[in-house]
Amino acid sequence: DRTIYEDANIFAPNLHAMGLMTNRDFSNYESLFELMERLVSPPDLLIYLRASIPTLVGQIHQRGRDFENTISIDYLSRLNERYEAWISTYTKGKLLIIDIDNLNIVDKPEDLGSVIDRIDAQIHGLF
């Protein structure tokens, strides 16, 4: 699931930059986010699944959701760039970045197991 941080740092700024959110609406959204951020604790561990555009496109096609079929490569690229910029400055808590270009956690239990092991190590430590 997405966090409130992604909406505020990636999706809303992207919509604003594309001219799909007015300055007033964007300002209101930022104010609401700042209020929410003071009331909600950050996650114990933020897991970022890093993927290239070809991987993202493949996953979208594999899911087969009608509403995702109209997503353009340009839009995906913009979001991916914003994700990379945001994640490089994330300081709210623990962060685990997993490159999923060469993983298949749906069909390969060993890939899923390695991801779970990495999550456990981040949350509970190595021992």
Label each region the model flagged.
Residues 57-70, 74-127:
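NTP-dependent small-molecule kinase module
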Residues 1-4, 26:
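Switch II (G3) loop of P-loop NTPases
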